[in-house]
Amino acid sequence: MLKFDLPKNQSSIIKVIGVGGGGSNAVTHMYRQGIKGVDFFICNTDAQAMESSPVPVKLQLGAALTGGLGAGAVPSVGKNSALENVQDIRAILEKGTKMLFITAGLGGGTGTGAAPVIASISKELGILTVGIVTIPFSFEGRKRKQHAEQGINELKKYVDALLIICNDKLRELYGDQRLSAAFGYADDVLSTAAKGIAEIITVTVFSGS
């Protein structure tokens, strides 16, 4: 089990949190690229998947519920896992946060189920909340698409803005690629979108430029 440990001096007003596998991958990309004045966090039910990320703050969701083995592509497990860690999530967001970006790949268990829980806490705290999510490739099947649609409907209840990236559109742009390459493009686009918006906000709004 990974220990939740919030750095004492880390309290930027803009935070980016990656939820689940896709969201965590995107935030890892962003962290490696580097954005000043933004705090990065990843949270997942899959403890092993988080270990390889250089992002310094990692929150394992639902350790008691899942045993660190993931949500099994079941959104209700992702939701209940986030509810298990409500106080930890709140502790992250309460430290002077003015704007929150939530990145997630929808269609699986953790991103789909946990992202709306995090968004609801953010809304409750009066934080400007932006969701940036991907929806599955068609070849991933009808069930994942239905899960993604449910996740979008839940997120819309709590976020101030929601950017939806359709993975099938990426296939149209990049053509037929190996499966790993296709998912890599999805992570890259998710990362680029969040990074671009966060940088615009950081430079033009909060710096007073």
Regions found by a protein language model. Name each.
Residues M1-S209:
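Tubulin/FtsZ superfamily GTPase core signature
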